[in-house]
Amino acid sequence: MEVQTKLTAGQISIMINARIKDMVMWLMEDFKYSLEEALDCVYNSELFEKLQDLETGLYYQSSGYNYELLKEEVKYGRILN
């Protein structure tokens, strides 16, 4: 089933990048990751794959919601829900 949205691909990309920026900053604050470690964590995560998949709708969710999922993945090695 294809997601129906009036957003352009560019707008969706901006939304995804905003989520990534916030999560990288929070990883650096909460886990004392370097910029490189935080970027590596996000871009190599299951969450990043799901964020890129428009079918999940995660790009519509807040940065905080996505960050909680990422923290689960960091702690448990996968997203639990």
Regions found by a protein language model. Name each.
Residues 1-81:
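C-terminal alpha-helical interaction appendages
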